[in-house]
Amino acid sequence: MDKIEVRGARTHNLKDINLTIPRDKLTVITGLSGSGKSSLAFDTLYAEGQRRYVESLSAYARQFLSLMEKPDVDHIEGLSPAISIEQKSTSHNPRSTVGTITEVYDYLRLLYARVGEPRCPTHHAPLAAQTVSQMVDKVLELPEGSKMMLLAPIVKERKGEHVKTLENLAAQGFIRARIDGETCDLSDPPTLELHKKHTIEVVVDRFKVRPDLQQRLAESFETTLELSGGIAVVAPMDGDGEEIIFSANFACPQCGYSMQELEPRLFSFNNPAGACGTCDGLGVQQYFDPSRVIQDDSLSLAQGAIRGWDQKNYYYFQMLTSLADHYGFDLHAPFNSLPKKTQDVILKGSGRTEIEFKYINDRGDIRVKRHPFEGILNTLERRYRDTESNSVREELAKYISTKSCSSCGGTRLRLEARNVFIADTTLPEIVELSIADALTFFQTLKLEGQRAQIAEKVMKEINDRLQFLVNVGLNYLNLSRSAETLSGGEAQRIRLASQIGAGLVGVMYVLDEPSIGLHQRDNERLLKTLTHLRDLGNTVLVVEHDEDAIRCADHVIDIGPGAGVHGGNVVAEGTMDEIIANPNSLTGQYLSGAKEIAVPKERTPRDPKKTVELLGATGNNLKNVDLSIPVGLFSCITGVSGSGKSTLINDTFFKIAHTQLNGATTAHPSPYKSIKGLEHFDKVIDIDQSPIGRTPRSNPATYTGIFTPIRELFAGTQESRSRGYKPGRFSFNVRGGRCEACQGDGVIKVEMHFLPDVYVPCDVCKGKRYNRETLEVRYKGKTIDEVLEMTVEDARTFFDPVPAIARKLQTLMDVGLSYIRLGQAATTLSGGEAQRVKLARELSKRDTGKTLYILDEPTTGLHFHDIQQLLTVLHRLRDHGNTVVVIEHNLDVIKTADWIIDLGPEGGQGGGEIIAQGTPEDVSQIEGSHTARFLKPMLK
């Protein structure tokens, strides 16, 4: 079977299509945004491949896997088990890092456990084995008369009931054991839970420390070491005080510091054996941040320098008044003029010093109490810890910042794990290197003798995985980077690298725009990776708009001709040449050059007097960057992946502007020296790819504000007025007009064990969300439900006489979203669609001509034709006097910009500098700029 046959696919907007996809080839599916590419690739081919595989498993196994819905298709044959690698950002788990996702960290843990050299954290001496005599001498140094017990660890953090182990110990004549920290009698041991981890230590001896114990202790230690395999624990019998761990294996000869045998879990920050005890392996601690708590240090405490502690809050202000009397400071002096010591008392408390507080109640009675002052930060911390109210917790969370853990310095690991070395390098130092540097380290690492033999296979796995990450253009990341901070494109390429590492054969891979966030320079390496996956013997399906990817494909499928209801057909399929030769294919016309996105005939000139200057930006890898953005122009920020574009624009420039122009209090910009020129703007708007809503109740109509005037129109009809209906009657979010059986969702979720959750249309309202009475009201012959089911295009015609609604609908059409339905659930919109809905909402607002717009890769998910529409919109914003700043890799966007700022020269530590800026023509001449190399041919 050398092909996949699809017959009668009708998923979403697909129009009963038939097609043949060659197996073990690289197939690119392209077409306009919303034409049905994802419906074919993910919701039909992947869903069916996955469903068939999961259905072959037992019912018991199926309950642990999410089953895909059966797609609406007559027949598919030739499918393999499918793996999808989507755009969605990886994980919101703070414990996930690049190292853990790619499994490189698992191999590093194994390597350090097998060939690492433990050292003493104090003396930095390699640990040596302790003799029984040394152990006895150490115990006899304890205070005479101390009651101690000698324990042999038998089971360490292992699941099971351990009945046999306990019976064997009793049979050997042992009387007591310490199980999970509690001492018990072995004649009547507790029943242990099968699925919990347990630690069992047998009590070998109990004694009072005295000098004549030498012989007895030596024998007891020998028994202990034999039982436990070289570890002995001496613990106080009353449970108070330090335990001493002895090891016949590792110990510092100077101070006796010893540690357990090296195991992979000792290096895991997700395991209690390896995680730092202070931050539980997260690497950061939360704290109430004085810079957030103090709203304005130029105000006095009485005026409200600290919110909630001013004169309006009588109870707290009385406390400050008593505090001021005691320490002799002025409540009406600016907070920043108070001595540092006084500020510390106000924020951190008076320690043990008792202060006389006078409290006056509503009736004027005075109560006097003496107690220390807790301090504002400690009060907030206590309230945050003790409250059961979510709203209080959310309010207090605004004042919390995170800082690197004080114990482990952000490495997440406990002391022992941080002091194991390979070639004088610790594991935390390795994961802080960029992936490219880590690869160099392991390629040049030379181990001797037996250690080299042990490490050989593990090193091969580490090198291979690091090489795959470099191949997909992620050489600038480091292994300790938190998964939460990765962009969608980075997350997808990490998963791609993991799949290549798995080395599977005979699988169908379905990828969603893997080139997102990738500079043209790195694109070649990505395409090589995809062809490598294919050459292993896999079928690779890629939804992609990138010209290089389309040219590289063995087979191309062009879905269209339009978007939404106008799409869903196979317009052209075959080789690249066949697509170009097909007159119906819009993609073919752009590839052949018959259609193109033109370079503007003239650039809008820059006014040197009107610029925004950001000086001294040093966040992440930025090297003291000075940024100058021209006001009133369309500027493009370019550079290879990881060069610092997002740090400079999103984390620094946008957050400063957001704070100063929009009055944001929770945006904390990356470090910088100064900024000037923001007076040219009245607001800043960041249009990113995050979802417009996380529930099916959110939709384009509610988000863009069209739904309110639509509900008002319905409430204004004759029928509504006679029934007394207000606009709220037509909302599916509140009681009154909505169907109460499904609470306005239109569907009811039925949980099915062993099968996917089923959403069935509500029996009462038949999926229409509203009750019968509400649906009896019609506007121009349509019910509110029928209006929500309209596409933007149909609604634009329908509401043409209503300017307030028509204008907003027109902007949705302008950004290429004519095909989405007004009531379409936000959860079904792609990242690119969500971004364009946001763009439409901003466009529909009254234009001041003084707005700063920031967009991060707006071409995600866009076909050449969609990009043309998007550029028209962005140029229109610019022509009205606004300033548009776009982070982008797409050369069609870059060549139409007025001004380019190129960061680089490389990613990670090799980047972080502005290497070129000017018009596209200027930048294309700069030597050493990767962007210039690819831009030059586009300007001819």
UniProtKB/Swiss-Prot annotation:
Q: Which is a Pfam family this sequence falls into?
A: UvrA_DNA-bind
- Bilayer-crossing residues are none
What range(s) does the ABC transporter domain occupy? 309-586, 606-936
Example GO biological process: nucleotide-excision repair
Location comes to: Cytoplasm
CDD domains assigned to the protein according to its UniProt record, in alphabetical order: ABC_UvrA_I (cd03270), ABC_UvrA_II (cd03271)
> What are the record keywords, sorted?
ATP-binding, Cytoplasm, DNA damage, DNA excision, DNA repair, DNA-binding, Excision nuclease, Metal-binding, Nucleotide-binding, Repeat, SOS response, Zinc, Zinc-finger
Query: Does ATP-binding appear among the keywords?
Result: yes
Q: Where are the zinc fingers (C4-type)?
A: 252-279, 739-765
Top-level taxon in the UniProt lineage: Bacteria
Alphabetized GO MF terms: ATP binding; ATP hydrolysis activity; DNA binding; excinuclease ABC activity; zinc ion binding
**Gene Ontology cellular component list:** cytoplasm; excinuclease repair complex
Matching InterPro entries? ABC_transporter-like_ATP-bd (IPR003439), ABC_transporter-like_CS (IPR017871), ATP_grasp_subdomain_1 (IPR013815), P-loop_NTPase (IPR027417), UvrA (IPR004602), UvrA_DNA-bd (IPR041552), UvrA_inter (IPR041102)
Q: Which residues bind ATP?
A: 31-38, 639-646
PANTHER family according to UniProt? UVRABC SYSTEM PROTEIN A (PTHR43152:SF3)
Protein task: The UvrABC repair system catalyzes the recognition and processing of DNA lesions. UvrA is an ATPase and a DNA-binding protein. A damage recognition complex composed of 2 UvrA and 2 UvrB subunits scans DNA for abnormalities. When the presence of a lesion has been verified by UvrB, the UvrA molecules dissociate.
Stated family: Belongs to the ABC transporter superfamily. UvrA family.
Q: How does it assemble?
A: Forms a heterotetramer with UvrB during the search for lesions.
Protein name, entry field: UvrABC system protein A
